[in-house]
Regions:
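Vicinal oxygen chelate
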Residues: 2, 9, 23, 30-34, ...
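Short acidic/glycine-enriched loop/turn segments that link adjacent beta-strands
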Residues: 36-41, 66-68, 100-105
Length: 128
């Protein structure tokens, strides 16, 4: 069963947002230099529970659109297959399958209630 594996936080002021999440949750962020090749700065971070066990990984970037908030990414075996399922079930694919460096592919969708979420497919799984 596909599961949420990554979430992305959009921020108007990335430094301020990083400080907020560090002060509140202890999350430290590491810049992903490879993403700069796509014309966008991006930071990764890992979450952990109170005992130090790893949680869902996250990322942060500068907000591109006023309506952009937090996006949860569900890892799937095939974005093409799940995009079709989404549309057949009353959802919409807003950003079609897009390559993200050598890691894999993403797509951004809306569910039947207009909530946005992302799909992620590892490159090793992809037939492109």
């Amino acid at each position: 069963m596909p599961t949420v594996e990554h979430f992305e936080i959009s921020a108007d002021d990335v430094e301020r947002a990083q400080k907020f999440y560090k002060d509140v949750f202890g999350w430290t962020m590491q810049k992903w230099s490879e993403r700069e090749n796509l014309g966008q700065e991006y930071w990764f971070f890992e979450t952990k529970d109170d005992k130090g066990s790893p949680g869902i990984g996250g990322g942060m970037m500068k907000r591109q659109d006023p309506s952009q908030g937090i996006t949860n990414y569900v890892t799937v075996s095939s974005i093409d297959e799940y995009s079709s399922k989404i549309e057949q079930s009353g959802g919409k694919v807003m950003v079609p399958k897009t390559k993200v460096s050598d890691m894999g592919f993403i797509a951004v969708c809306l569910d039947s209630e207009n909530n946005s979420f992302g799909l992620f497919e590892y490159a090793a799984q992809s037939k492109q």
